[in-house]
Amino acid sequence: MQYLKPISVFSEIGRLKRVLLHRPGEELENLTPSIMQRLLFDDIPYLEVARQEHNAFADILRNNGVEVVYIEDLISETISQCDSVKDQFISQFIFEAGIRTENKTQALKDYFYNMSVNDMISKMIAGVTRDDLKNYKSDSLNFLVNSEYPLIVDPMPNILFTRDPFASIGHGVTINRMQTRVRRRETIFAEYIFKYHPIYRDNVPIWYTRDEDTTLEGGDELVLSRDVLAIGISERTESESVEKVARKLFQQKTSFSTILAFQIPQSRAYMHLDTVFTQIDHTTFTSFISDDMKFTIYALTYDLGSGSIKVKSEKAKLEDILGFYLGSKVNMIKCAGGDLIHGAREQWNDGANTLAIAPGEVIVYFRNHVTNRLLEEFGIKVYKMPSSELSRGRGGPRCMSMPLIREDI
């Protein structure tokens, strides 16, 4: 379906029309206990079941009128348009995979060029093993010293979480600089899609690029309304990045008049702002915080006269902050009702990380039964997806999706 703008996201809850996903692939099969921590996984999901669960996720979306787009298809369409773009993409991917020797670079180029574009993209995500390049021999010191390491190019298992590499804001996007080196290759795909894909090139303003020197991740970016954007200052996103995004949005005269920077704890439990709260209805949010916990927030606004950004700081309860800037009292539904045992367990399994597909309609993990029951009692329509394997990646339905089109509310 064609839309007036290829990116249009002015809320967290407007009816979802088009969404970007990545279906788990062989990258999960290349995770091993010795490298999973470095690749930001706490456990190894079973691929066959993870795919079944992800298919169920996509089916829920499609059954509710959402067009599902897969990132591997978008990037394949992008680089198939022009041989020079494909050549450039392959060279950049190999370089950013840490390959520096001429012989190994050429061996990988030959390997990738002998595949279809779709198979090549799948293999880039899955990782390249020594067995894949059986004919490649090297007497370099680095190759010999690391002879027991089975991978030449590491897998990209975190690309499952399409929320983070770029973020849709209004009619534009931020193409993010990821905090961890192992995730930075993921944003190459977004860079090429928005630069060369016929639907997106020349039609999508870029609010932030992956070449910036400060970090920003999509899990910290929440579009609260046409006027208000929230960004977390977190373990993964730096305060300087918030200012850069704010300045771009203000200078380009977008509808966003206030950027709220939330300073959250620097810990894995609060990895991104969407682990602290997500919006599920006009005035209803899920959260994983205590009633008396106060946040330091910084409200960034623009002075048209001087062309400068004004920053006002305040410390208040989350519900008071959201209520003030949204203009109405809000309701906070705590993960598992705030129960010390159920709340901690269900937060670990992303009980508060919901994906709104329309106001008052959310996709959740089936396993978080206490939180799900509370949502239903509150009148929220809950679509439950299986998650025994996907939850091992420590990301919920919101983490695994990037809205491209939402209806206005």
Curated annotation (Swiss-Prot):
Listed under GO cellular component are:
cytoplasm
- Protein location: Cytoplasm
Which GO MF terms are attached to this record? arginine deiminase activity
One family from Pfam that matches here is ADI
| GO BP annotations listed | arginine catabolic process to ornithine; arginine deiminase pathway
Q: Which UniProt keywords apply?
A: Arginine metabolism, Cytoplasm, Hydrolase
Q: Annotated pathway, please?
A: Amino-acid degradation; L-arginine degradation via ADI pathway; carbamoyl phosphate from L-arginine: step 1/2
Q: Is Transmembrane helix given among the entry's keywords?
A: no
Catalytic residues as annotated in Swiss-Prot or TrEMBL: 399 (amidino-cysteine intermediate)
User: What is this enzyme's catalytic activity, as reactions?
Assistant: L-arginine + H2O = L-citrulline + NH4(+)
Q: Which InterPro entries match?
A: Arg_deiminase
Q: What is its EC number?
A: 3.5.3.6
Q: Which family does it belong to?
A: Belongs to the arginine deiminase family.
- What is the protein name given in its UniProt record? Arginine deiminase
Q: Which organism is it from?
A: Borrelia turicatae (strain 91E135)
